[in-house]
Design a protein with these regions (language model features):
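Short, aromatic/basic amphipathic alpha-helical patches
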Residues: 5-19, 98-111
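Short amphipathic alpha-helical interface segments
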Residues: 153-192
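Donor nucleotide-activated moiety binding/catalytic core segment of transferases
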Residues: 43-60
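A short, conserved structural fragment
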Residues: 209-223
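Conserved BB-loop
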Residues: 20-47
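Short, amphipathic alpha-helical interaction segments positioned at domain boundaries
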Residues: 229-267
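Long, low-complexity, charged/polar intrinsically disordered regions in eukaryotic proteins
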Residues: 104-156
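Cross-kingdom TIR/SEFIR domain
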Residues: 75-118
């Protein structure tokens, strides 16, 4: 279909790659479109769901192009945690200058950080904009911030997602109960409590895996979870080199091939 500013921005961000020690390329940025992901199993309403997505995201980019996106912008800007991550791409029109959106949410973002607001005159203008180009590069090259979970009573959802992705990448393919068992064993947790669950229903690793599947971090095949091949999280929870990762992986695959050869068909 025809490019929109949102589609074009996603395409630009997803072009950024990172190489491992062996030259294999992986995506540096995983873009998620919130309204395509919402299901009632994960949250009672879309605003609570989007707030949860904001919690697990490094950046929130809102292309203000419809009443729905204006509502999102207002909701995110009113929440301090979300506001600090939000970037808005808004059309630069004379009639918008005194609008509620411009004087309210956009102004709040500008007061916090002028670089978090980009005003444009259409897609073709953006394609040649150095300001937009700088924004894309800044977002794509920003260091991922993850605080490893050490307290079973205060599990941060974002950290948990990457920790589980790390486990899956090393030991895939895995069933749900194996992932949970490995996580508890590695962490030495008897149980765990996920923080900030007031607005959503993600209180278990099983639900976290549903979310991870919907955002494209993992996929499920014949009941087994495997990592998205375009993404790598092997060194989130463990401080190991790629060689050490490969050594562990080869030993595990050889054992799996010997005792459960049917699993090899999933890879």
């Amino acid at each position: 279909g025809q490019d929109t500013i949102r589609k074009y921005t996603i395409k630009r961000l997803e072009k950024f790659k990172a190489k491992n020690d062996y030259g294999t390329e992986y995506k540096s940025v995983l873009c998620v479109i919130s309204e395509y992901l919402y299901v009632q199993d994960l949250s009672e309403d879309i605003f609570s769901f989007e707030k949860m997505l904001a919690e697990i995201s490094d950046k929130i980019i809102i292309v203000a192009e419809s009443p729905g996106t204006f509502c999102e912008l207002g909701a995110f800007v009113m929440d301090e945690q979300c506001r600090n991550k939000t970037i808005v791409i808004n059309e630069d029109k004379e009639e918008y200058k005194n609008s509620f959106i411009t004087k309210g949410p956009v102004k709040m973002l500008e007061n916090r950080d002028e670089q978090s607001v980009i005003l444009h005159n259409g897609l073709e203008w953006l394609k040649f904009s150095s300001v937009y180009d700088d924004l894309i590069n800044k977002v794509a090259n920003e260091t991922l911030k993850i605080h490893i979970n050490n307290d079973s009573k205060q599990i941060h959802l974002k950290s948990l997602i990457y920790e589980l992705a790390n486990i899956i990448e090393i030991f895939q393919p895995l069933e749900f109960f194996e992932i949970e068992k490995l996580y508890k064993k590695i962490k030495d947790f008897d149980n765990y409590e996920i923080l900030n669950t007031e607005g959503h229903k993600i209180r278990s690793i099983k639900k976290v895996l549903v979310l991870m599947e919907r955002i494209g971090l993992v996929k499920k095949d014949k009941g087994y979870y495997i990592i998205n091949k375009k993404i790598s999280c092997y060194n989130i929870m463990f401080t190991i080199s790629r060689k050490e990762f490969n050594d562990v992986r080869i030993k595990y695959i050889n054992r799996m091939d010997k005792y459960q050869p049917q699993r090899m068909e999933i890879l």
